[in-house]
Amino acid sequence: MKYLLPSAAAGLLLLAAQPTMAANTGGYATTDGGDVSGAVKKTARSLQEIVDIIEAAKKDSSGKAVKGGAYPLVITYNGNEDALIKAAEANICGQWSKDPRGVEIKEFTKGITILGTNGSSANFGIWMVNSSNVVVRNMRFGYMPGGAKDGDAIRIDNSPNVWIDHNEIFAKNFECAGTPDNDTTFESAVDIKKGATNVTVSYNYIHGVKKVGLSGSSNTDTGRDLTYHHNIYSDVNSRLPLQRGGKVHAYNNLYDGIKSSGFNVRQKGIALIESNWFENALNPVTARNDDSNFGTWELRNNNITSPSDFAKYKITWGKPSTPHINADDWKSTGKFPAVPYSYSPVSAQCVKDKLASYAGVGKNLAVLTAANCK
């Protein structure tokens, strides 16, 4: 099902006018990005202008390079790449071999926020490398080119303390002839790997993506703490996320149309899967493709409470020939440790009924609370 996400208010409002507030991401991230004292605020109309603004912020007034950045940045992006997105949609199978397009935030730790205006759009990604204190909000990413060359929408490499909030990421969830190893035509929506940790992914609308996201790039890239909350995943294939070790807290998400597998908890990781809504899903919680180093999960207050609910919500299970564990008894296999942040989950039913009015772009960063569930 494709969700029609209503706008929180009419008109194209510049979100740069939002007041500064202390970071409360509802998860492991604790960053305000660049929206702090001393921030320089800029407006960009294109990928290249974002790149130029970031590069300028790496130098002081004399032009000397400053390690980690010379000042915090808030970049308001008001560009529109709908024409490129429409052209990509008309030539889906031609996107794989193209060069990827993206903004690289490299070795920038001073703090940076990239904030899209309502009505903006991007046919490019945002890639973080050896950075920290990064916030990406209200950006609409569509049909990223360069799947053969790791053309992710969001990539977080060795970059702690990142908040990905109120974005829309979309592609086409089918296979084109000629892509290798039965791989995807498009790359990931949000990959978090190579030492990245303390990341919150919230209020995003992700649809038509085959491989949604990694937590860790290999069996030795483990140990991160991630939170996913209030996201809508529709018509997706797998990796929600593919978790290699560490801790994942996922609450108040809506999963509709999982075609292969959802949570894949590997390398002795643990996931708290709390107050979510699942429907039309194949293998929504599993551990597979990992020899015997299976992870564990705690299932808490989801719309599914026992196997008797599977038929009602169209939950099905597959049994691969390789070692695996499915949550087909819908029982917890581990106990998640206490989280270091405060959060107030709403009921799974409220997620089903109300989340579409809050997740994604054009919602003026509105959040869903219990008061909205009445």
From Swiss-Prot:
The keyword rRNA-binding does not apply. GO terms for cellular component: extracellular region. SMART domains: Amb_all (SM00656). It catalyses: Eliminative cleavage of (1->4)-alpha-D-galacturonan to give oligosaccharides with 4-deoxy-alpha-D-galact-4-enuronosyl groups at their non-reducing ends. GO terms for molecular function: metal ion binding; pectate lyase activity. Belongs to the polysaccharide lyase 1 family. PLADES subfamily. This is Pectate lyase 1. It comes from Pectobacterium carotovorum. The gene is pel1.
